[in-house]
């Protein structure tokens, strides 16, 4: 978990999508057949985009609706100038409500989807409890929580309260039989200042992203509060639960001297043949980076800034997906969730020079509905998403330069980059460490150009860095070699 600093601190801050176009819908029969086709194709993993326009809706089908009749009658009383003014105003309002971070979509989520999710979970009995789980082994520990592996017990299973599973027994367990549904559990620390608060925030952000951008983070199953105290649980303590997708994060893989080759078969399904060693490593890093930035683009589109992007918070699934975890430091700048102006949450090794996701003079957020209405203006003026993009640049540099993967190497880099005012080109000329930049220099230095546009100061206009969407349009990604390798590997397995 990130650390806390006060404002008095004297430092400065997927695969290519197929575009499947379908014919316009003209009759209810066509709608039925089209829907069955869409359902079949979606199960096969094809992303559908229907070519549909309002002209395809018969006017007679709306004429019997009272609101439509009232609208037509009101519009008929308008002059041509008034009609133009009405439609222009409606267009501006629509553009504003749908601009990032999504006032309209956020309102639908908050007032419709979130209560609906809670109601459905309660109705079908999906609420979790302590006796549903068997904790197997400890995986790690942070400032505010302890992470464990575990299993979801069958409904007819009985659990002895004081049972403790040894590490050896956990490894010997059959995860294809009775204990087939593995989970990751995080115990929110009890009695630690700030732990309960961050546990609440992490739960909220995981629920929010499970609805808005489910493929960006590990699948969140919910939470429970322990109802009694024993060797593992403390009464009243909160636990968060995710479906098991992998027990190793990017930092774990980067500790291995063979990185990034140790991820080759995971990312591409096989070892790439006929590709030079340096180019193979570059393709692996590019595929990892593409997934990271794609996930950031999606969460930024919801108004959320992670604020703690680093290898330890990027889990690698067994299917070769990179997913964000640990949202305790995240902020939803659409409604001001977990944003407090007088403090900042950061890891000093990965945070940008501005330290704060918004300028220090930004006031405390108003009530949520007002904050949501003002959020598009705040976002356009301050581009808070660029906070995460600096951290993403550090991750790219670490993956590409072996000497920066160690704690000491990264700290030394941060001292050097600060001394040259966060200008990577000047750092390259002056550093005494002689880093190996061969991976970034491939393809006419496209990787180096990208990283210099991520690791930089914001400037007076609070721009100066690429957003996630702009980074994905950079020539480094447009070459698509990593995507081609991934597609070819899937084709070879399907034969």
Swiss-Prot record:
The active site is at 308 (proton acceptor). It catalyses: L-seryl-[protein] + ATP = O-phospho-L-seryl-[protein] + ADP + H(+); L-threonyl-[protein] + ATP = O-phospho-L-threonyl-[protein] + ADP + H(+). The keyword Transferase applies. Residues 133-477 form the Protein kinase domain. Disruption phenotype: Not significantly affected in state transitions. Enhanced thylakoid folding and reduced mobility of thylakoid proteins under low-light conditions. Keywords: ATP-binding, Chloroplast, Kinase, Nucleotide-binding, Plastid, Serine/threonine-protein kinase, Thylakoid, Transferase, Transit peptide. Belongs to the protein kinase superfamily. Ser/Thr protein kinase family. Light-dependent serine/threonine protein kinase that specifically phosphorylates N-terminal threonine residues in psbA/D1, psbD/D2, psbC/CP43 and psbH, which are components of the core antenna complex of photosystem II. Phosphorylation of PSII core components facilitates the exchange of chlorophyll proteins between the grana and the stroma lamellae. Also involved in the phosphorylation of the calcium-sensing receptor (CaS). This is Serine/threonine-protein kinase STN8, chloroplastic. It comes from Arabidopsis thaliana. The lineage of its organism: Eukaryota, Viridiplantae, Streptophyta, Embryophyta, Tracheophyta. The gene is STN8.
């Amino acid at each position: 978990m990130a650390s806390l600093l006060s404002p008095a601190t004297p430092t400065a801050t997927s695969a290519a999508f197929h575009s499947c176009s379908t014919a316009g819908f003209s009759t209810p029969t066509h709608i039925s057949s089209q829907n069955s086709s869409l359902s079949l194709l979606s199960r096969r993993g094809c992303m559908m985009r229907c070519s549909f326009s309002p002209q395809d809706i018969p006017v007679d089908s709306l004429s019997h609706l009272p609101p439509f009749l009232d609208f037509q009658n009101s519009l008929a009383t308008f002059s041509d100038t008034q009609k133009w003014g009405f439609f222009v105003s409606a267009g501006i309002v629509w553009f504003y409500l749908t601009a990032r971070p999504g006032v309209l979509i956020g309102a639908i989520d908050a007032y419709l989807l979130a209560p609906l999710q809670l109601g459905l979970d309660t109705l079908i009995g999906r609420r979790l409890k302590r006796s549903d789980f068997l904790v197997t082994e400890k995986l790690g520990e942070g400032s505010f929580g302890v992470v464990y592996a575990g299993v979801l017990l069958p409904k007819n299973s009985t659990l002895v309260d004081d049972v403790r599973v040894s590490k050896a027994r956990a490894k010997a367990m059959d995860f294809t039989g009775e204990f087939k549904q593995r989970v990751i559990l995080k115990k929110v620390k009890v009695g630690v200042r700030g732990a309960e608060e961050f546990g609440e925030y992490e739960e909220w952000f995981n629920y929010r992203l499970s609805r808005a951008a489910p493929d960006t983070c590990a699948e969140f199953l919910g939470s429970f509060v322990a109802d009694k105290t024993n060797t593992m649980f403390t009464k009243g303590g909160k636990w968060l639960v995710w479906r098991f997708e992998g027990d190793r994060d990017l930092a774990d893989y980067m500790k291995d001297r063979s990185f990034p080759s140790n991820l080759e078969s995971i990312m591409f399904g096989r070892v790439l043949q006929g590709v030079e060693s340096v180019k193979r490593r570059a393709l692996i890093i590019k595929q990892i980076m593409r997934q990271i930035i794609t996930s950031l683009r999606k969460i930024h589109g919801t108004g959320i800034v992670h604020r703690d992007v680093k290898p330890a918070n990027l889990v690698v699934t067994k299917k070769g997906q990179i997913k964000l975890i640990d949202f305790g430091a995240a902020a939803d700048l659409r409604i001001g969730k977990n944003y407090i102006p007088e403090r900042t949450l950061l890891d000093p090794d990965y945070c940008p020079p501005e330290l704060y996701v918004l300028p220090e003079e930004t006031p405390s957020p108003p009530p949520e509905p007002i904050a949501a209405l003002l959020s598009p203006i705040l976002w356009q003026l301050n581009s808070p998403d660029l906070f995460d993009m600096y951290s993403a640049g550090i991750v790219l540099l670490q993956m590409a330069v072996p000497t920066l993967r160690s704690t000491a190497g990264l700290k030394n880099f941060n001292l050097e980059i600060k001394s040259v005012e966060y200008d990577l080109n000047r750092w390259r000329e002056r550093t005494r460490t002689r880093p190996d930049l061969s991976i970034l220099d491939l393809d006419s230095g496209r990787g180096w150009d990208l990283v210099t546009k991520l690791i930089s100061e914001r400037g007076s206009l609070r721009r100066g860095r690429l957003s996630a969407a702009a980074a994905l349009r950079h020539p480094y990604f447009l070459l698509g070699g990593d995507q081609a390798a991934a597609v070819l590997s899937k084709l070879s397995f399907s034969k």
